[in-house]
Amino acid sequence: ARKQINKLLYAKLGTNDVRKKWWNPQDENNEKNGYQQEKFKFKDYAKWTGDYIFMRIEEMFLTAAEASCRLNDDKGARLMLNSLMQERDEDYTCKKTGTALGKLTSDETGSLLEEIIIQRRIELWGEFGRIYDIRRLKQGFRRTADMGWPSSALIASTDTEDPESYAWV
């Protein structure tokens, strides 16, 4: 089965966000709480020819936004984030401030840093090792079937909520 975005993350996309086309909510193969991805397609299935993404300018914008935010330059961080997002959703405007993050990736604080991380998750979905961001941010995570995770990916026997645990790396 192809990878699917969970509905909770998909719901964070604005109504006019062009990235919504990266997933198909109508696909007959969707899991209960996930949507099939349309972001990556093979040019030639027989030869496995396709896109190999190493870094995009969008990642640079998001990295600069995060760095500015961590340096308490909320204005600069919002400028970088809003510049990128105007290419994705012309209705998007971020006015958030602060660097608070929840203990778990699903714990929302409403901070600017959290918004940058959410947009990073969406923008780089399927391209970059999300697990490295989770480790770097010192957050734990929780996977549930309600979030769209198949039973094989739930990691039920591992304490993923402890950000210091190396059992899930």
Functional labels for PLM-detected ranges:
Residues 12-169:
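Acidic/polar-rich alpha-helix caps and helix-coil junctions
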Residues 1-8:
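His/Glu-based metal-binding/catalytic segments typifying zinc-dependent metallopeptidases
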